[in-house]
């Protein structure tokens, strides 16, 4: 049961997220924040959250794409549940255990807010969508920081800690960037959006977001190998 929640569920949820988002990209009708006539999904021009729009920027109903994207968000709740079981793997060291508990305290609401990203499509609830997105990243940043410390005090190699520290720095910088960024609604404030942001700026932000998300997914997978070793260490 411990390996099921602490290793298997994390891997299954991550794999499902990747598959569901890939399907959502394939089924996305088209349009981005600047080019409304774009056909299909562009990896470097569309944000991931656009997959959850009720209507795309091109004005098309986005039912199928949003269905798979939202299901990927909901699966993150399983990761939140999994992290309830993880702190006990660090119980051999009181510092590791304490820091992992703090990490879990932050990562569970982070997963809930990531679900909120799907529940607040940006084309309908722009301000709520921005709030859930920034809050999710902020909470996740703090959680990764404490889990990095937990791995440092654990009997495992600091390889796992170093990876999470690098992610903490990357996500932390991105969260700081989002905090200082003044988002403009590309639908209701379209003229202001087009006069403020260029295509190069859009592409930069889209690619940065995808890099951060990719690092987050890789870190979870790397964590599972470290957690699996902790399970074997306790036997």
Model-flagged regions — what are they?
Residues 106-156:
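Membrane-proximal helix-loop-helix units in multi-pass membrane proteins
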Residues 144-235:
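Terminal transmembrane helical module of multi-pass membrane proteins
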Residues 78-109, 234-235:
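Cytoplasmic juxtamembrane regions at transmembrane-helix boundaries
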Residues 88-91, 116-124, 176-184:
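Juxtamembrane "helix-exit" motif on the non-cytosolic side of transmembrane helices
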Residues 55-89:
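Individual transmembrane alpha-helix segments
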Residues 4-33:
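N-terminal signal-anchor transmembrane alpha helix
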Residues 14-18, 72-82, 138-147, 211-226:
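Hydrophobic cores of alpha-helical transmembrane segments in multi-pass inner/ER membrane proteins
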Residues 33-61:
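Extracytosolic (periplasmic/ER-lumenal) interhelical loops and adjacent juxtamembrane/interface segments
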């Amino acid at each position: 049961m411990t390996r099921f929640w602490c290793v298997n569920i994390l891997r299954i949820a991550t794999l499902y997220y990747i598959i569901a988002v890939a399907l959502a990209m394939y089924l996305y009708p088209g349009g981005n924040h600047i080019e409304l006539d774009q056909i299909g999904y562009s990896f470097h021009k569309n944000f991931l959250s656009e997959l959850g729009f009720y209507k795309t920027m091109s004005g098309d109903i986005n039912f199928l794409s949003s269905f798979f994207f939202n299901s990927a968000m909901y699966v993150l709740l399983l990761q939140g549940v999994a992290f309830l079981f993880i702190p006990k793997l660090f119980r051999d060291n009181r510092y590791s255990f304490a820091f992992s508990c703090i990490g879990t305290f932050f990562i569970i609401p982070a997963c809930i807010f990531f679900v909120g990203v799907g529940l607040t499509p940006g084309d309908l609830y722009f301000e709520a969508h921005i709030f859930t997105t920034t809050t999710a990243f902020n909470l996740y940043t703090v959680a990764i920081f404490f889990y990095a410390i937990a791995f440092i005090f654990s009997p495992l190699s600091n390889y796992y800690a170093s990876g999470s520290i690098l992610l903490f720095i990357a996500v932390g910088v991105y969260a700081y960037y989002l905090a200082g960024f003044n988002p403009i609604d590309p639908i209701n404030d379209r003229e202001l959006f087009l006069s403020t942001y260029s295509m190069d700026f859009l592409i930069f932000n889209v690619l940065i977001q995808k890099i951060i998300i990719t690092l987050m997914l890789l870190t979870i997978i790397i964590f599972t190998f470290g957690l699996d070793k902790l399970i074997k260490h306790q036997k």
